[in-house]
Amino acid sequence: MIQLRPHQERATIAMRQNSIGQILVPTGGGKTLIAIMDAVKRFEVNVPRTIVVVAPRILLAEQLCSDYLEHVTNANVLHVHSGETKHFRTTKSDHIKLFVEMCQTVREHVIIFTTYHSLHRVQESGIAVDTIYFDEAHNSVQRNFFGPTEYFSGHADRCFFFTATRKTSVTINKPGMNDREVYGDIIARVSAPELVKGGYIAPPKVYVKEFGIHQNAKKITCDVDCEHVISTMDDIDMKKILVCVRTSRQLMNLMAHTDFAQQCQDRGYSFLYITSKTGAVVDGKKVNREQFFETLNTWGKDPEKKFVVLHRSILSEGISINRLDSVIFLRNMDVICLLYTSPSPRD
């Protein structure tokens, strides 16, 4: 039996006492486990139930699936998005309906993992949803996502919104999480100081390194990027590093046209990255997405393992990296992305 942290326990109690609401927890505070424990509780009954988990990206939907299935063992899994997965996947509304109806016929539970882009397919299927969890719920206020969000807020038996960065609106013409009819009230809120005081997250330390001035950022070569990252790794004691690149092209140039990979290996670091163009790569070998995340989780849990993961915005998309202790920025970020891209080595 998992021992929840005090703030997680408060949140699960609030979810049992409310059928709709917002759960606001800082990055690294364990929002996913709160939802998982609620799902486990909902699946304890003999009556078949359907739970939907919504993520902003396919990568996160796949990682959430892996996290949920460590604890949810009595539900059939369906993915509704265009990504690859070992589970049954479809974006056709009639197939979604058929899948759920077949499971209900044999009185079995269903858990659906989808994205905001594909949520309307679940809506079109017309299935009855017991509970829906909106992960990184600030994404739901986007105009093209708000319709399905509003629908499930009114049609699902239970509806909960998880985020660290709540987005509100001051005009009736723009969706915002202060719309109580859609999002409900804030039923659980956790502050970052509480998590720091409890030792659950570590306050970030900022190191500023000065390099030579480049008048035109577009002329910064991949060799310069390599030099900047490697010198930072040499100057600061780091084990598990995220390098935030500007674009996939910058990442590909760094790996293909410099000795960055060899420099990492010479220092005892493994490396991995994943993009839509290159696919998933671990230490120079192409792997599938499931192998990528399995490797990322395994390395993250090993306190002695040193690795570098390169991505554009993996943390700001809600994807977690266990025991990440450092982030090197090669790009600018907006405030929300910057808040999400903070290491939480005690997670």
Where in the sequence are the language-model features?
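Walker A/P-loop
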Residues: S19-M37
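Conserved strand-helix element at the start of the C-terminal RecA-like helicase core
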Residues: V52-V53, R57-L60, M233-T258
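Conserved helix-turn-beta segment of the N-terminal RecA-like "Helicase ATP-binding" lobe
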Residues: A61-F88
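Post-DEXD/H (motif II) to motif III coupling segment of the RecA-like Helicase ATP-binding lobe
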Residues: Q142-G198
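Conserved interdomain linker/interface between the two RecA-like ATPase lobes of SF2 helicase motors
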Residues: I186-V245
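Conserved helicase ATPase core of P-loop NTP-dependent helicases/translocases
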Residues: T278-H311
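A short beta-strand element within the Helicase C-terminal
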Residues: S320-N332
